[in-house]
Amino acid sequence: MENQPKLNSSKEVIAFLAERFPHCFSAEGEARPLKIGIFQDLVERVGGEMNLSKTQLRSALRLYTSSWRYLYGVKPGATRVDLDGNSCGELEEQHVEHARKQLEEAKARVQAQRAEQQAKKREAAAAAGEKEDAPRRERKPRPVARRKEGAERKPRADKPTTKAPRAPREEKHTPVSDISVLTVGQSLKVKAGNNAMDATVLEITKDGVRVQLNSGMSLIVRAEHLVF
């Protein structure tokens, strides 16, 4: 019996399942909610194929169902599917609420990681600035030439000491002309008067774009109020 190739990562297992059961799993785009108990169905249908173990299948399912694209698919009115794409009933409200909380927690973790990275960059920039501001080696003053007796000192012309203040640099933003180019999870800014607030795309609807501000508040905004 020939040795079958082995899948080494959960992503490879998901790609295999998407090819093996295209009406149930997807490798990209919004995912469909899975039937409850689908793990046992997988063990029965693909057990032994590609040298897959139960542990690999369980890890791949955990990664698949915790991804943002899967959690976005768990919404009111959606139906669960089995391995062949057959409907297995509409989602319960408690499952939709659980998925919503998981998605919010995942986004909060990403924002915390970004804030930590930005803080490290600021610390590194500050450290580099301190090195540049280190005192330089003091130069010895040149000896002053003696004036001849009777020579008069010429008055120096006064130099202007004040400089015209620079105009504050206006931050430039690129308006969002087409919301179809946006993707879920993308970072942009929402215009509010003369200010622009950081936000993250949650959903693209026919009425506009649903975004979440750094404060945690979510709202639907029209394209003319969005900039990069």
From Swiss-Prot:
GO CC annotation terms, alphabetical: cytosol
Keyword field contains Lyase: no
A GO BP entry: post-transcriptional regulation of gene expression
Disordered: annotated segments: 108-178
Subcellular locations according to the entry: Cytoplasm
InterPro entries linked: ProQ, ProQ/FinO, ProQ/FinO_sf, ProQ_C
Family: Belongs to the ProQ family.
Protein name (record): RNA chaperone ProQ
Source organism per UniProt: Salmonella newport (strain SL254)
Gene: proQ
